[in-house]
Regions:
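NUDIX/MutT-family hydrolases
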Residues: 79, 88-120
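Active-site-adjacent beta-strand/loop module that shapes the phosphate/pyrophosphate-binding cleft
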Residues: 61-86, 120
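Generic C-terminal helix-cap and adjacent flexible tail
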Residues: 121-127
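Conserved hydrophobic "DFG−1" position in protein kinase catalytic cores
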Residues: 2, 10, 80-82, 98
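N-terminal strand-loop-strand
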Residues: 1-23, 51, 55
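The catalytic Nudix box helix
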Residues: 24-57, 78
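Short aromatic/basic micro-patch
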Residues: 23, 50, 72, 98
Length: 127
């Protein structure tokens, strides 16, 4: 979760999974890549921003439709701080913007993002 001046970075997903939903930037880990390196790369690819990746903020999972589910994704969200770049949607993001944490609930979010916000409610979000 990239935090800048009290706002969080959201992207609108352009890829097939959760298409059109708003979420924090993220994606798959490449073979041989650390989780933190993957997080920094995904933010750069999807938003054009360079980030310093900090502590683990949240761990969760999400399942696709069907039985068995169409997909099962493990989620590890880190605190991120912008250190460079210029904001702009790229790669599989159709839009990218900073929004106030409380305002994020007004966006069309996947269930995993709603759970993340529920878990953070009332907590001091690190910057």
């Amino acid at each position: 979760m990239v935090i800048d001046e009290g706002c969080i970075l959201l992207i609108r997903r352009g890829a097939a999974i959760e298409h059109g939903k708003w979420a924090i930037p993220g994606g798959k880990v490449n073979y041989g890549e650390t989780l933190r390196a993957a997080a920094a790369r995904e933010v750069l690819e999807e938003t054009g921003l360079e980030v310093e990746v900090g502590a683990v903020l949240w761990v969760g999972e999400t399942f696709g439709e069907g039985d068995p589910p169409a997909h099962h994704i493990g989620l590890v969200d880190f605190v991120g701080r912008v250190v460079g770049g210029e904001l702009g949607a790229a790669d599989d993001a159709d839009d990218a913007r900073f929004v106030e944490l409380a305002e994020a609930r007004n966006f069309d979010l996947p269930s995993s993002m709603q759970r993340l916000l529920d878990d953070l409610q009332g907590s001091e979000v690190p910057t």
